[in-house]
A protein has these predicted regions:
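N-terminal small/polar loop signature for handling phosphorylated ligands or for N-terminal nucleophile
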Residues: 185-223, 227-239
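Well-ordered alpha/beta subsegment
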Residues: 122-145
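Short, basic/aromatic beta-hairpin or loop at an interaction surface
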Residues: 60-70, 107-122
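Glycine-rich phosphate/diphosphate-binding loop of Rossmann-like nucleotide-binding domains
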Residues: 147-199
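Short, Lys/Arg- and Gly-enriched loop/turn segments at beta-strand edges
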Residues: 95-98, 102-106, 144-150
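Short, solvent-exposed secondary-structure boundary/capping segments
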Residues: 16-19, 104-109, 164
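Electropositive, beta-rich accessory/interaction domains or terminal extensions
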Residues: 1-93, 98-100, 132
Length: 239
């Protein structure tokens, strides 16, 4: 069983979080008074206490919240937990939604140390059940259920739709097919993200890597970008 070692918040984005020792987590929103709370999949950020201590041993002058993490948890290698894992602490229930993130190379820790552990060690979660959380509270890991729905991301590629010159009809059509399949074939899908991109290769590559590595979705569906125009590069990006 793990333990909460710090509860960190910041009221403004771009500022270091401070350990407030206890806070209220709000369902489907995040930590009360924290700048990163909101209706998105990265409501709460977490780091392993042991990984922070290893980094400190290299001479890093850091305090709780220096990496922008909300919760510091001991007893678990958090990055090894798959997306979909749930973390229970008292009445609070979180679900892991992302592993790692892109680093802002200009952060203060990176400037000093030439390294930052948040991109490879940090994880993110949504609040399924809210409540109070405090330093010293126990944390229990609940592994993902085998019969949970397949997680899906839908990506539409269209220069005109991205520019607002045309409605995206393909993405919603794919969502409808998935919902109809649930009723017909009894296969459950959970659409995690719907993304509209301009045509081209690099933007799609970045999203495919993020969705596969960080979000760990089971299925990525793309539509558009398969014609003969120079910017129709969906097959090339996927390969």
């Amino acid at each position: 069983m793990g333990k909460i070692m710090a509860v960190n918040i910041s009221e403004k984005k771009g500022t270091q979080k401070k350990n407030v020792h206890s806070a209220r987590l709000m369902e489907e929103f995040g930590i009360e008074k924290d700048a990163h709370a909101g209706k998105w999949h990265r409501q709460v950020s977490l780091l392993s206490y042991e990984k922070i201590e290893e980094f400190k041993a290299k001479g890093a002058p850091i305090e709780d919240g220096a990496f922008g993490e909300n919760l510091i948890v001991s007893g678990y290698d958090l990055k090894a937990l798959p997306v979909g894992t749930r973390l229970r602490s008292g009445e609070v229930l979180l679900e892991v939604t992302q592993i790692g993130k892109k680093c802002h190379s200009g952060c203060e820790i990176y400037k000093i140390m030439g390294d930052c552990i948040m991109p490879r060690e940090g994880i993110f979660a949504e609040v399924l059940t809210g409540g109070m959380i405090r330093v010293g509270d126990c944390v229990e890991v609940v592994m993902p259920q085998e019969d949970r729905p397949y997680s899906v991301a839908v990506i539409t590629l269209s220069d005109k739709a991205f520019a607002g010159e045309r409605d995206d009809l393909s993405g919603p059509a794919i969502e409808k097919i998935l919902k109809d399949s649930e009723e017909k074939d009894h296969i459950r899908f959970d659409i995690k993200e719907t993304i509209l991109l301009p045509d081209g290769e690099e933007g799609l590559k970045k999203q495919l890597i993020r969705l596969a590595d960080q979000r760990q979705v089971d299925l990525i569906l793309t539509t558009g970008g398969t014609g003969f125009a120079p910017r129709d590069m969906t097959p090339e990006a996927t390969n």
